[in-house]
């Protein structure tokens, strides 16, 4: 699986066991992601942070 880094022009290949890509936003500003990468389990959203997870190459 290949996931985009913070700047989507760059990506990385995920290590074994991390089979989801994710994008994290501040709830107050959903237009600008603050973090992207590989993850094993999609975190729950909080009052401050929103996560979007997916499982295809460069989907984040």
Curated annotation (Swiss-Prot):
Gene Ontology process terms (BP): killing of cells of another organism
Q: Which domain of life is it from?
A: Eukaryota
Principal cellular location given in the protein's record? secreted
InterPro entries the record matches: Cytotoxin_Cobra (IPR003572), Snake_3FTx (IPR003571), Snake_toxin-like_sf (IPR045860), Snake_toxin_con_site (IPR018354), Toxin_cobra-type (IPR054131)
Give its localization: Secreted; Target cell membrane
Q: Give this protein's Gene Ontology molecular function annotations.
A: toxin activity
Gene3D superfamilies hit by this protein = CD59
- Keyword Protein biosynthesis listed: no
Q: What PROSITE patterns does this protein map onto?
A: SNAKE_TOXIN
Q: List the disulfide bonds.
A: 3-21, 14-38, 42-53, 54-59
Q: Which GO terms describe its cellular component?
A: extracellular region; membrane; other organism cell membrane
Tissues/organs with expression: Expressed by the venom gland.
Keywords, comma-separated and alphabetical: Cardiotoxin, Cytolysis, Disulfide bond, Membrane, Secreted, Target cell membrane, Target membrane, Toxin
Please give one Pfam family short name.
Toxin_cobra-type
Q: What does this protein do?
A: Shows cytolytic activity on many different cells by forming pore in lipid membranes. In vivo, increases heart rate or kills the animal by cardiac arrest. In addition, it binds to heparin with high affinity, interacts with Kv channel-interacting protein 1 (KCNIP1) in a calcium-independent manner, and binds to integrin alpha-V/beta-3 (ITGAV/ITGB3) with moderate affinity.
What family is reported? Belongs to the three-finger toxin family. Short-chain subfamily. Type IA cytotoxin sub-subfamily.
Q: How does it assemble?
A: Monomer in solution; Homodimer and oligomer in the presence of negatively charged lipids forming a pore with a size ranging between 20 and 30 Angstroms.
Mind telling me what this protein is named?
Cytotoxin 1
